[in-house]
Amino acid sequence: AAVGAGTGAIIGKRMDKVKAEAAQVKNAQVETVKDTNGLDAVKVSFDSAILFATNKAELSQSAKNSLAQFSKVLNNNADLDIAIIGHTDNTGNDGINQPLSVSRAQSVNSYLLSCGVKSAQIKRIEGQGSTNPVADNSTAEGRKLNRRVEVYMYASQKTIQQAQQAN
């Protein structure tokens, strides 16, 4: 169902607040994106250089510190849905990169759950391997940027319904 402009504006304002809160997290890059309903959502990217060693899915201590801080943002916004997407650079083949990207997303998920984030809030955990680069894989810097985990925070059906009623 289409969501009206008034509802979109209410959710947009809410996401601006969430974005500002998430921007305080160490090592997080934050931006506003559109969700599948065309509503504002917040994408938080964590650089895998901070999160993981090359070819590994175990979280580093600095990653745990950042994710513990980020879990507070998620807990403060428990009515939002979450998707966790892992990515790799194009070094190696899909047989390695695809499962590695899934393992990285699962590592982030497990740690967020251990920090008190509710499992019901997390709607999707997936890996996209090297299929969705954000930088040039032919440079070391580009590959570093492509090794990442993204966490999307978006309006749940309940949040949309509340915004529609408030409108």
Feature-to-residue mapping (PLM):
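Short, low-complexity, glycine-enriched hydrophobic/amphipathic alpha-helices that associate
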Residues: A1-A20
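Extracytoplasmic/secreted proteins, especially bacterial periplasmic and envelope-associated proteins
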Residues: A2, K17, S62-Q69, G95-P99, ...
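Amphipathic, membrane-active segments
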Residues: R14-K43
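Envelope-exposed proteins and targeting segments
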Residues: K26, G38-V42, F46-S48, N55, ...
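Solvent-exposed coil/turn segments that connect beta secondary-structure elements
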Residues: N27, V33-D35, D47-A49, N55-A57, ...
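N-terminal post-signal-peptidase region of extra-cytosolic proteins
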Residues: A28-Q29, Q69, V108, D136
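Periplasmic peptidoglycan-binding/anchoring modules of Gram-negative envelope and division proteins
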Residues: L51-I85, L113, K144, V151, ...
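Periplasmic OmpA-like peptidoglycan-binding domain that tethers envelope proteins to the cell wall
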Residues: H87-Q162
